[in-house]
Amino acid sequence: TVRHPLCAKYPPSTKYRRSFLTELIKKHEATAAEPLDELYDALADILNEEESTRSYKSYLLPSGEPVTLSESVAIVSGGTTGLITWDAALQLAQWAIENNSAFRDRTVLELGSGIGFTGIAICKTCHPKAYVFSDCHPAVLQQLAENIRLNGFVLEPGKTRHIQTEPQGQEEEATNYQNPKLNPRLIVAELDWGSVTEKQLLDLQPDVVIAADVVYDPEIILALIGMLQKLAACRVARKAPEVYIAVTVRNPDTYHLFQAELDKVGIGWRIIPAHSKSIFLYDVQPNVTILQLFI
């Protein structure tokens, strides 16, 4: 958190480092051991730092490789909640890592990618053929592209493509210069569920569709279901994509509405059993359920 080379390069928030060191010093003092000047010096340095509106968070994958994200320190920033990583994204990534055969050599479309944790983790561990990150808020898309680059995926000069997913939509094709043969084709797409058409979705042709924490409002639910119906309708001769949605159940009524609306349009669903242990550190209190949908 403080002296690790990764955290020195990409420091966590000032508040977090201050709290961490304060608690560590308390625990050290409670052992009656010799004081460690290094801890006090580090805390003094942090106390003199100004708070920033942005910080970094790093998560270690089972391989030991990190996923590092630049995040907002505020839950709501720039009129959106999409500039931080939510627990559902962590749990969906964990499920994907434990079930990587569902993604290997396949084209994945992520709806509501936010700042990119789930997709970056999948791209680093599950070896998809192609991965389409999507969102609709300009600030989120900008931060998403930055985080993809931050994790070793670099936008190739001259390879940026403009594909109309809505009137001002844009996709950015990215690749990793370090291992180009092993890495998926990456796309960042501006995607508005309400205005996108079946014709515009034809180019994507995903084998797998995923989303995390996108079921929180009745209007969003209807737009999401409409989006899934469009994806089902434009599959041409291919079979329908597999769909996995990680839902944080904050309001049971909203969750039940989602299930009822799925039933109403004939989209089947089942609850995927929860994993037994956590790969990433997250709050175990939120009730996150992963659903498989059959469109």
Model-derived segments and their meaning:
Residues 1-295:
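S-adenosylmethionine-dependent methyltransferases
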